[in-house]
Amino acid sequence: FQAEDGIRDRSPSRGLGDVYKRQAQLAVQGKHSEALIQKLCDTPLGEIGYYHFRKAKIYNFECIIARTGYTGEDGFEIYIDSKYAESVYKSLIEEGKPFNLQPIGLGARDTLRMEMGYALYGNELNENCNPLEAGLGWVIKLQKNDFLGKAALKKQKDAGLSRRLVGIRLLDRGVPRPHYRVLNEGSLIGELTSGTFSPSLNAGIGLCYVSTEYTKLGTKLDVEIRKQKVPAEVVKLPFLPSRVKKTNC
């Protein structure tokens, strides 16, 4: 919405229309996602590179298929007119039975994105942080022409960051949650922006903004869970290896 306001301010003569209410998104993630969707679509999905998309048809329903996701797995996101979404969803569920396809909700997706260290708007991303602090400097091209926020980002990069987003793994039993306090030698140094139990790691994990002096891998911390200090340490992100197919075609 900030981008929308910026466009309206800088180019008031250009029209903007809301299309998201007319569009639905279906995300199919996992190692069999390409084979499954290919059964419903004539477009050669193997030719779609990571973070690329193509216009396509599924059962004669026009859609956009992107090789993107929020899980750390190879997968696709299908953008389609909302009135066709239910039919396509049911077809995916039926055709997905041989692949053991399972419908999942936001809870499962949130665990997967946390294991990848992916930032979530409202948690790791808001008006009080920036892409450099969040580890998203790879999406910022400061050598490009002027864009909203460029001057501020360049100034901060030149001066050096005062804090960074880090991954934290519990060393003892416990389930960390957002806003739990993070301590170093008894002193408060931050609070978790996200936290959960990782079934893959069999450990509690979380994300937190801390001063750069605490960002070194292996730094010992404590997470306060129900008034108890649970030992933790700063670990490398992502928590698990990514399995996205990053080869661009």
Which residues does each predicted region cover?
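Conserved, structured C-terminal
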Residues: 14, 18-249
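Single conserved hydrophobic/aromatic residue that forms the stacking wall/gate
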Residues: 1-20
